[in-house]
Curated annotation (Swiss-Prot):
It is an enzyme of class 7 (translocase). It catalyses: a quinone + NADH + 5 H(+)(in) = a quinol + NAD(+) + 4 H(+)(out). This is NADH-quinone oxidoreductase subunit A. The chain crosses the membrane at residues 12-32, 61-81, 90-110. GO terms for molecular function: NADH dehydrogenase (ubiquinone) activity; NADH:ubiquinone reductase (non-electrogenic) activity; quinone binding. It is a multi-pass membrane protein. The lineage of its organism: Bacteria, Pseudomonadati, Pseudomonadota, Gammaproteobacteria, Enterobacterales. NDH-1 shuttles electrons from NADH, via FMN and iron-sulfur (Fe-S) centers, to quinones in the respiratory chain. The immediate electron acceptor for the enzyme in this species is believed to be ubiquinone. Couples the redox reaction to proton translocation (for every two electrons transferred, four hydrogen ions are translocated across the cytoplasmic membrane), and thus conserves the redox energy in a proton gradient. It is found in: Cell inner membrane. Keywords: Cell inner membrane, Cell membrane, Membrane, NAD, Quinone, Translocase, Transmembrane, Transmembrane helix, Transport, Ubiquinone. Belongs to the complex I subunit 3 family. The keyword Signal does not apply. It comes from Blochmanniella floridana.
Amino acid sequence: MQETECCGVLSYIVGSVFLCVFMLLCGYFLGGRSYSRFKNVPFESGIKSVGDARARFSVKFYLIAMIFVIFDVEGIYLYIWSVSIQETGWIGFIEVCIFVFILLISLIYATYVGVFNWKNRLNEYSRVDSLYIGRSKFFKNDK
């Protein structure tokens, strides 16, 4: 290695170490201190814990997360198509139109079933029951 390359690597290492030490010292001198009995409680840093860590979430949060991931991955497919649009031509355009049409149908179906509806419907049949089991949403005593 030449002398200039060694100086560049050495100055990078010295600068990185100096930056790390500087940030640690700033945190030590400028940071607050806690001397309470909750100092060693995990993840709380001296603040009294409130509540239980085992909080339950509604299933609707997981449904929204799954729908987000599905549509996000499909967005990646559309990005890949948009990068290679010249190679695919009209056939690729028609395939993407069919793909987007299927996406829109699935989004309309999810809206119809009530995935995005967060109201409680305790006395009504859900639309999923009426679609799969054959129950009518108009007649509540249908069995």
